[in-house]
Amino acid sequence: MEFAAENEGKSGGGLHSVAEGVRLSPEPGREGVRDLAGAEEFGGGEEGTGLTGIKEIGDGEEGSGQRPEEIPMDLTVVKQEIIDWPGTEGRLAGQWVEQEVEDRPEVKDENAGVLEVKQETDSSLVVKEAKVGEPEVKEEKVKEEVMDWSEVKEEKDNLEIKQEEKFVGQCIKEELMHGECVKEEKDFLKKEIVDDTKVKEEPPINHPVGCKRKLAMSRCETCGTEEAKYRCPRCMRYSCSLPCVKKHKAELTCNGVRDKTAYISIQQFTEMNLLSDYRFLEDVARTADHISRDAFLKRPISNKYMYFMKNRARRQGINLKLLPNGFTKRKENSTFFDKKKQQFCWHVKLQFPQSQAEYIEKRVPDDKTINEILKPYIDPEKSDPVIRQRLKAYIRSQTGVQILMKIEYMQQNLVRYYELDPYKSLLDNLRNKVIIEYPTLHVVLKGSNNDMKVLHQVKSESTKNVGNEN
């Protein structure tokens, strides 16, 4: 833009110098040289065009001896160019003043100088033709430079918009800026984001009872390789599978039952703990109410009742022995005699050595067979699914099971067992035997190598030895 303005100033200055240096000599038949003021008088006071003054000069030239045929042709050309000059000047002034006058006031002064040159010039056709031709060249240069300047502004705006989009989207693109190429940094940003999103693995921490923690954020505390899926309600250890659950129960001797009376500090006491305590009190009240309604457990057992139990057992051929109060078996025993049905309801303990399981059956009538007693445990169809899973060694066995009962009042080093008939009733199997508090039945697999020696096997071995000696 500055270069265009300098060229324009030079061209305007040249016109002014040419106009000042030209001094037209008087021609024959004319009174003298008329300057621009005289042209205004001949033109009737019109400013800007001077068309009337030129016409009067042409009339004066008719008497001067010039060719009358050439002058009208030149006047028509001059008229058209002079008529077009104000419009061209207005367009140039409008564009220049709107875009560049505020920043560069010198251009406005040069336009004013051109107007003065136009007014001070003589009526010479050659000078006027040179003046009128000059502004057309200036107009084209100004238009071209103005267009270039607007394109530069649009390119700058586009670059600013691209940079804003680049920062907003957090994506760096390859762009040519000052002849240098900016490399893409997408991969670098992605690596940083991935590093930030990684979760650091922390060693397992034993949280107190009642503490909540998401299972997805912990590992199995038994194997330490898989993701935790279960949590033991008692010891709060995390496990991933059934083998890990069994392993942790065997190692820690945990029964998997939540301890409802475990200590919880005030800081860790939550609404869930309050609800658990409330339900525990409800269970205690329900148990107390159940005992109060039970006719047989309503009163404490007196010595008279103990003698009554022994006498009834003796009548059925059972030698029943009762322990003093305070012994564990005495507390556990729930055996009673039903006077209406005239039968015993026994407290029976069932032990499964091959599965290391132990169960208790209460109020078992003495007329019930042993097979009926074992059906809820080892029957493939009628047994409980949880118990069946634990006793699957007995269910899958094709050899069957043996029911044994320990012989009481034997020497300490001699442990022998009775083999019971599973098809007979409990009363028939207990006759002529000694029972301490309640019967304990050992269910073992046939043919398994164990240290349990049955009584009839001992008798057969003794008879063989006697025969060999004879």
Curated annotation (Swiss-Prot):
Required for box C/D snoRNAs accumulation involved in snoRNA processing, snoRNA transport to the nucleolus and ribosome biogenesis. GO terms for cellular component: extracellular exosome; nucleus; pre-snoRNP complex. Zn(2+) 1 binds at C220, C223, C240, C244. InterPro entries: BCD1 (IPR051639), Znf_HIT (IPR007529). It comes from Homo sapiens. GO terms for biological process: box C/D snoRNP assembly; maturation of LSU-rRNA from tricistronic rRNA transcript (SSU-rRNA, 5.8S rRNA, LSU-rRNA); protein complex oligomerization; snoRNA localization. GO terms for molecular function: ATPase binding; enzyme binding; identical protein binding; TFIID-class transcription factor complex binding; zinc ion binding. Residues 41-51 have a biased composition (Gly residues). Residues 1-70 are annotated as: Disordered. The keyword Ubl conjugation applies. It holds the Pfam family zf-HIT. It comes from the Eukaryota. Keywords: Isopeptide bond, Metal-binding, Phosphoprotein, Ribosome biogenesis, Ubl conjugation, Zinc, Zinc-finger. Belongs to the BCD1 family. SUPFAM superfamilies: HIT/MYND zinc finger-like (SSF144232). Disulfide bonds: none annotated. Interacts with FBL, SNU13, NOP58, NUFIP1, RUVBL1, RUVBL2 and TAF9. Interacts (via HIT-type zinc finger) with the RUVBL1/RUVBL2 complex in the presence of ADP. A zinc finger (HIT-type) spans 220-254. This is Box C/D snoRNA protein 1. There is a cross-link at K79, K108, K118, K138, K143, K153, K162, K173, K183, K200, K459 (Glycyl lysine isopeptide (Lys-Gly) (interchain with G-Cter in SUMO2)).
